């Protein structure tokens, strides 16, 4: 369960972190601050939110996912995704800032720029995944609320 939830959170969080790191847009500082704020979200709060959303009387209650084994990964994914997004943005931003002008000057297309910068930051991304896995494997509170018992 920890492995699958950390993989899913890593994929979503890395995508969000890359989008924020690569793009300059109005309100970027607010988005980064919001991501970093969500990194400190208490696990029990996440468990309660997911439980309320998917319980029988919640907006997604008709899906009948609560207390199922497959649904147990939802709480850690919600908990870990902001952590991965924030750490990815923090790790990638300096590399983007230094390498992007050179890559643009050499005529690299946007697709190639992204893959070159990801390759340049592979060790940081490995560390981000290991942290996500450690967080997922140590998570008990949110999973117990969503899974029962």
For each predicted feature, which ranges?
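Transmembrane alpha-helix signature in integral membrane proteins
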Residues: 1-20, 129
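Alpha-helical membrane-protein architecture signal
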Residues: 27-30, 67-70, 77, 81, ...
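Glycine-rich helix-loop "coupling/hinge" segments at transmembrane-helix boundaries
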Residues: 142-149
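Cytoplasmic-entry segments and transmembrane alpha-helices of multi-pass inner-membrane transporters
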Residues: 16-50
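Loop-to-helix entry region at the N-terminal start of transmembrane alpha-helices
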Residues: 1, 52-83
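Transmembrane alpha-helices
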Residues: 7, 87-88, 110-141
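A hydrophobic alpha-helix feature that marks transmembrane segments and, especially
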Residues: 86-94
């Amino acid at each position: 369960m920890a492995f699958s939830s950390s993989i899913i959170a890593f994929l979503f969080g890395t995508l969000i972190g890359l989008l924020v790191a690569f793009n300059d847009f109005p309100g970027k500082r607010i988005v980064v601050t919001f991501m970093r704020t969500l990194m400190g979200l208490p696990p029990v709060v996440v468990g309660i939110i997911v439980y309320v959303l998917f319980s029988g009387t919640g907006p997604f209650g008709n899906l009948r996912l609560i207390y199922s084994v497959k649904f147990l990964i939802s709480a850690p994914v919600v908990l870990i995704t902001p952590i991965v997004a924030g750490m990815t943005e923090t790790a990638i931003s300096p590399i983007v800032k230094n390498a992007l002008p050179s890559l643009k000057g050499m005529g690299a297309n946007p697709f190639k720029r992204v893959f070159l910068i990801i390759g340049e930051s592979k060790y940081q991304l490995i560390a981000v995944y290991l942290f996500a896995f450690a967080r997922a494997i140590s998570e008990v509170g949110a999973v117990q609320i969503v899974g029962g018992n």
